[in-house]
């Protein structure tokens, strides 16, 4: 499992010149979460979340409500998939959207 610093470094290097990841990344049990806002998506982004465990989903829903995000977007890593990658505001990985 990558460290938080490795993820932040990856996000800093992964976008094009017009894209800068300026939102904080927070660690929690089971992974990390962050968010972004644009015309298409206003979601809590959960990175490195493992499985569909109920406790994780409950915690993510609670955080999404606190952050006033209408959706949770899971970018998951499992079954040997590469680390979830964010490019230009798009999540490139297995994505699961859940309405809060």
Regions found by a protein language model. Give the residues of each.
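Amide-forming acyltransferase catalytic core, primarily the GNAT-like/NAT-type
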Residues: 1-27
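Terminal substrate-recognition subdomain of acyl/acetyltransferases
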Residues: 2-10, 36-40, 75-100
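A broad, low-specificity signal for short, low-complexity segments enriched in glycine/proline
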Residues: 6-13, 33-37, 54-59
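Conserved donor-binding loop and adjoining core beta-sheet/short helix segment
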Residues: 19-55
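Short glycine/proline-enriched coil/turn segments at helix->beta-strand junctions
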Residues: 23, 27-30, 67-70, 88-92
